[in-house]
């Protein structure tokens, strides 16, 4: 198994798909990295030469990935909560932050329904 940015990526898949297993690398970023490294998108991960692996690693080193990216996202959310912005308040209360209605739905964000004693329609 090849290892990029501390993540084992699958051998049998095409390299363009395998790179998306790294947090912070989607399909478009994967295509850009491979183009800059001069590696074909159709090659399988197991068929990469060591030179090609090194070229891909050099391109990935310039990106913010895995732990650094996760840390930045969590710090951004923490900053929103500290400054008391609307989005920060929604994060603090565990509600959707992007304007969705919460009267009937939003169960993923709010958690399981809490029954209210004596409430009947």
From Swiss-Prot:
Residues 88-121 are annotated as: Disordered. GO terms for molecular function: rRNA binding; structural constituent of ribosome; tRNA binding. Keywords: Ribonucleoprotein, Ribosomal protein, RNA-binding, rRNA-binding, tRNA-binding. One of its GO terms (biological process) is translation. It holds the Pfam family Ribosomal_S13. It comes from the Bacteria. Residues 106-121 have a biased composition (Basic residues). Transmembrane segments: none annotated. The keyword Ribosomal protein applies. GO terms for cellular component: cytosol; small ribosomal subunit. The keyword Ribonucleoprotein applies. Part of the 30S ribosomal subunit. Forms a loose heterodimer with protein S19. Forms two bridges to the 50S subunit in the 70S ribosome. Belongs to the universal ribosomal protein uS13 family. Located at the top of the head of the 30S subunit, it contacts several helices of the 16S rRNA. In the 70S ribosome it contacts the 23S rRNA (bridge B1a) and protein L5 of the 50S subunit (bridge B1b), connecting the 2 subunits; these bridges are implicated in subunit movement. Contacts the tRNAs in the A and P-sites. This is Small ribosomal subunit protein uS13. The gene is rpsM.
């Amino acid at each position: 198994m090849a290892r990029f940015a501390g993540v084992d990526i699958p051998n049998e898949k095409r390299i363009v798909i395998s790179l998306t297993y790294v947090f912070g690398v989607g399909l478009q970023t994967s295509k850009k990295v491979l183009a800059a490294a001069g590696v074909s998108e159709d090659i399988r991960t197991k068929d990469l030469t060591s030179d090609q692996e090194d070229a891909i690693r050099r391109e990935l080193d310039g990106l913010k990935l895995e732990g650094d990216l996760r840390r930045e996202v969590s710090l951004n959310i923490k900053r929103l909560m500290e400054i008391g912005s609307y989005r920060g308040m929604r994060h603090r209360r565990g509600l959707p932050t992007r304007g969705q209605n919460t009267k009937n739905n939003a169960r993923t964000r709010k958690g399981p329904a809490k029954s209210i004693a004596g409430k009947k329609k």
